[in-house]
Every structure is written in C-alpha cells, then in structure tokens.
Amino acid sequence: GASIDIGPDVRVITSTSEGYRFHAAEGIVFKDLHPTQLNLSFLSSLGGKDSWRRYFQPKLANLVYTAELVYRYPAIKFVAVHPGVRDTELTPAWIKGNARSRRLFAPGGLKTAEEGSWNQLWATTGNNVVSGQYYEPVGIVGYRTPKLKDETPRETLWD
C-alpha cells in the first residue's frame, strides 16, 4: 500500500478528567456501556452516585483509548488532557458553594472556559509533549491508576 508522510509532529489531543481516578474498582464496566444506561437508579438525575459513575467511566475510557492509539500508531503523538475543574452549569452546587469542597475537588480554583482551554492549547503547540502522556493543567504529568497499565481494557475497548 501507499505510505503517507504525516509530518514530524502530528498530534491528537483527547479530553479527559482527573475524575477518572474515581472509576469503579473493576475499571471500565463494559456490560454497563450502552447508549441508555438502563441499570442506573432514578437518583442519577439528581446527581446520585450512578451519575458520577457514568461520568467517570468515559473519562477512564478516553485514557485507555489514548494508550491504545499510541500502541497502534506510534508515528503520531497522542496525549490526554484534563482542563481543570471549570465553572460551568455542569459543576455541582456543592463544589461551587462550599469552600471545603472546592479545596478538595478544585484545589487550583474553578477555571473559566478560557482557562479550561489552556492545557489543551499547551498540548497542541507546546514543546516536550510526550506521546501517551496524561497532563493536568498546565503541562503537569498526571497520576495514572493501575487500571491504565492493564492492556486487557485497551483491547476490549478497541474491539
């Protein structure tokens, strides 16, 4: 087949969240991944634990998927970034309105939409961006749970 010259520094940036760390103990629960989350409780719409589980799973999946892309396409630079905790309509009132919660869940403070873009812009244009890495704002290597080192979820997610 024909080869394509992709250039010296092609980058694909995936958005995730440091909240991925609160994923289920088993990691990605593939049996629960459906367009409609039928097994979630009615409390989900009220911000119950199931809505958070639904939030954390795709954030973990984005990191797992990024790792698989690095493995399959080594000539391209793939990284995942966390924008920081932003002050949006999705930010729970218990974080916005409680100083203790903000210190715990948003230690750098709530970010504006503009500030939330800085990490992605850095990953897109910055020097010393390492393929396969997960970065927290701005350009800081983020913590990786043991589930990110397991190749089985990468293969299952890809299939």
Q: Locations of the language-model features?
A:
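Rossmann-fold NAD(P)H-dependent dehydrogenase/reductase core
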Residues: 1-89
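Short, glycine/charged-enriched secondary-structure capping and boundary segments
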Residues: 27-30, 93-97, 150
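Glycine-rich loops and low-complexity Gly/Arg-rich segments
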Residues: 36-41, 103-107, 157-159
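Alpha-helical membrane-targeting segments
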Residues: 43-50, 85-87, 91-112
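Alpha-helical packing segments of well-folded alpha/beta enzyme cores
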Residues: 62-65, 116-120, 157
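Secondary-structure boundary/capping signal
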Residues: 77, 98-99, 131
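C-terminal helical subdomain
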Residues: 104-145, 153
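Intracellular terminal tails of multi-pass secondary transporters
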Residues: 148-159
